[in-house]
């Protein structure tokens, strides 16, 4: 079920301050965040966030197409190695 419109988008409180500081400094440095559940807002377009996936920070450059999505969608937590190959079928 989607979030109610009257509540507005979810965002951890510290993130707006970090984004404002990064934009004011003018340097394009990675902003480290642990909040995968936060919604991407229009103010974040053009900034690079390091989204923690449980092991390391994955750099995510925010574009206009990402607005309204969650940060966790762009930082995968699991590695897919492929399905096991049947050795008997491969020999034929």
UniProtKB/Swiss-Prot annotation:
Q: What is the protein name stated in its UniProt record?
A: Small ribosomal subunit protein uS19
The Swiss-Prot or TrEMBL record annotates one GO molecular function as: structural constituent of ribosome
A single GO CC term, please?
cytoplasm
Entries under Gene3D superfamilies matching the protein? 30s Ribosomal Protein S19, Chain A (3.30.860.10)
Per the record, the similarity remark reads:
Belongs to the universal ribosomal protein uS19 family.
Q: Name one GO biological process term.
A: ribosomal small subunit assembly
Q: What is the recorded function of this protein according to its Swiss-Prot or TrEMBL entry?
A: Protein S19 forms a complex with S13 that binds strongly to the 16S ribosomal RNA.
Which key words tag this protein in UniProt? Ribonucleoprotein, Ribosomal protein, RNA-binding, rRNA-binding
